[in-house]
Amino acid sequence: MKQMRLWGFLFLSSFCQVSYLRANDVLLPLSGIHSGEDLELFTLRSSSPTKTTYSLRKDFIVCDFAGNSIHKPGAAFLNLKGDLFFINSTPLAALTFKNIHLGARGAGLFSESNVTFKGLHSLVLENNESWGGVLTTSGDLSFINNTSVLCQNNISYGPGGALLLQGRKSKALFFRDNRGTILFLKNKAVNQDESHPGYGGAVSSISPGSPITFADNQEILFQENEGELGGAIYNDQGAITFENNFQTTSFFSNKASFGGAVYSRYCNLYSQWGDTLFTKNAAAKVGGAIHADYVHIRDCKGSIVFEENSATAGGAIAVNAVCDINAQGPVRFINNSALGLNGGAIYMQATGSILRLHANQGDIEFCGNKVRSQFHSHINSTSNFTNNAITIQGAPREFSLSANEGHRICFYDPIISATENYNSLYINHQRLLEAGGAVIFSGARLSPEHKKENKNKTSIINQPVRLCSGVLSIEGGAILAVRSFYQEGGLLALGPGSKLTTQGKNSEKDKIVITNLGFNLENLDSSDPAEIRATEKASIEISGVPRVYGHTESFYENHEYASKPYTTSIILSAKKLVTAPSRPEKDIQNLIIAESEYMGYGYQGSWEFSWSPNDTKEKKTIIASWTPTGEFSLDPKRRGSFIPTTLWSTFSGLNIASNIVNNNYLNNSEVIPLQHLCVFGGPVYQIMEQNPKQSSNNLLVQHAGHNVGARIPFSFNTILSAALTQLFSSSSQQNVADKSHAQILIGTVSLNKSWQALSLRSSFSYTEDSQVMKHVFPYKGTSRGSWRNYGWSGSVGMSYAYPKGIRYLKMTPFVDLQYTKLVQNPFVETGYDPRYFSSSEMTNLSLPIGIALEMRFIGSRSSLFLQVSTSYIKDLRRVNPQSSASLVLNHYTWDIQGVPLGKEALNITLNSTIKYKIVTAYMGISSTQREGSNLSANAHAGLSLSF
């Protein structure tokens, strides 16, 4: 069992008394299997004053040590002095710790100094048992440039199921530049007693101020680990940082009492390139995924997702001091849950905490987060839970929500700031110069049952709220209850049925001050008015010009609402006073009621804003009335010129299929003799593109597929060819959202007759092209269309190879006459605002004229043929594709012109053919430059067998 090449370097005498290695630098090779049959000879000790290096050539397995009754640290490796290194001497180096049981810390390794694992093909810690870490150090613990690391099914009756950093001085645990996966699976830290707490199911640091860092790695996974504090990682007095990792970092189904996945003082996610996922982690008490004093998320390009995590408080995150999320990519909190009103997604209990959410270059979204009335209640039972995203229990020192232009913070679940205080919540603070985005409170994603209960859509902020810039939108029937509201800039927009209200015991200082009010048209099906209400002694002051806000193109293109008069309203009510004029005046504090004409795309008309005739001092109603003119202006993006243009995609596919079959050599039985039958086939690729700098609607077409066919000789100089080509293609245009995918089938028949130098040829091709298009309209819906293009192409041509006296070199002028006719069938789209497209037709008569330089090396068993040709192509007669279209719902009709292509082109082609016995390999590359900056290129290759 013992196969260990170590005896020339040290003598292992007993477990308690071992010969020590004493040298400045010690290098020890390791390989084979080292098992624990003899407990006294199992431990490998080192004490070099500088460093000890173990060099691994292949697998080295340390295993099967039953030392539960041994209470001295370090069963397999014990390093008492100097740094310890495990390095590779070959790319196959691997180190495994397996089935090692020890009644102390460090079942696999215990070191008083720094330990580094570097360059290993694999490092495995599996099925080990200790009272604190399989690998335990009082110095730095580093994993650098390894291919894979696996820690699985390890258990500790104390901190650190797999890895433990201990000691009184600040040290560090690093995972850096590892090239493969880092896996921590089903590790467990059991809470044995006060001196052996179960902190960190997989990784733990009980060394004060010691950082745990994962940087520049690939995939990282913590799954089904368990601990008392930190199901996966614990570092109460230091920082846990994930930075610049390139693939997914995942925490899945980890469990703890506090911090289902992570328990630390600082939890940092910096510059993550891959996604970072916290999924189905659970804490019996606080912090379903993360429990920390400080949480910082910034500069992460990948998505950050907290989904289906649960706890008593803080379903996803529980923070004591600072939660600062700066979203460079999407950040989502989805379906997390907590107990009571303790933060379905984020919970902050302490007074003086700081919460900053900034949608920088990515959106932040809270959706489906809940708080339950009973801890074990079923989450799908609607009577047992309330929607809630964030709960701030103590009065916060700072609370800010910011979004850059084009980005959003979306609360589809309410938030609660429970303690009354006068520290303002800032929306898009002036210190953030680019903060012109939207903060949205919405009930749009609630189920019909949950929309009936206001608690599921009411956000309570017991602070003054200040809107500095950008947009605050309250929509989908949501309610925002605040201590007071001051609009210093930006736009306050309310959707039908939504409400902004003060709450609590208000004084005369508490006001709702609005300078720019918007009507949000996000829910046209609702006729409920929006409401702005001031309770108790609070008042409302409103000024400025009202406006219509939202994804308004969805309204103006809505055939049901925009084609006829439409009204919506906002009620302003206060127990004390609503300050707003009944007619226009010069005072800047007065609300100017004006008429606004709409001249964009969709139905034309104007908005008129007016006061209700039943207004009082305590209640006023602003009514926005839409009056259409009856005219309609089509958005150019919906013209659909792309539809008839797809005939050019069919045309290019038809041409390449025909050119492959018309191979000058394979069709010439005098050059490549054919007696009975030839079968051939191979791949095909083509791309056609217009120069985007010279065409605003440049066309891009790509084909990829294959063909199969056969050649049959009718006589010694007459060959009939037939082929079937299948192409899969995609077509798109710049500045047009439409994009189609197609499957093209082409059948080709060709007849060739050769007399030494003279060759005559003719061909006929028929094609069926099935096109499918999908168009997604932001905030509107999706339309889909499918149609059929079909047609045929025929050609006749001749070529003459000379001089006759030179066998190996030929100059071959050629000329062809080609005619193509293609038809696009009419069709009707399905989905959002469908369009009808009539049929379109394209015909083209072209005359290619050119010359080829041929090199022929003909042998008895093998032959080589090379051909370079250039040709000028003139389209003699052309009917460009054109069509007409109409909107199905209002019958608005318009004409469509397909993208035209130039009528003159230059082509360069390179063909090569190699024949050996009955096998022939061929390849062709071609490029065509057409006037109007249209460039196409194609390539094909294949094999043929002759019989």
Curated annotation (Swiss-Prot):
GO terms for cellular component: cell outer membrane; extracellular region. Its main location: secreted. Disulfide bonds: none annotated. Residues 1-19 form the signal peptide. Residues 672-947 form the Autotransporter domain. It is found in: Secreted, Cell wall; Cell outer membrane. The keyword Membrane applies. It is a peripheral membrane protein. Keywords: Cell outer membrane, Cell wall, Membrane, Secreted, Signal, Transmembrane, Transmembrane beta strand. Pfam families: Autotransporter, Chlam_PMP, ChlamPMP_M. Belongs to the PMP outer membrane protein family. NCBIfam families: POMP_repeat (TIGR01376). This is Probable outer membrane protein pmp19.
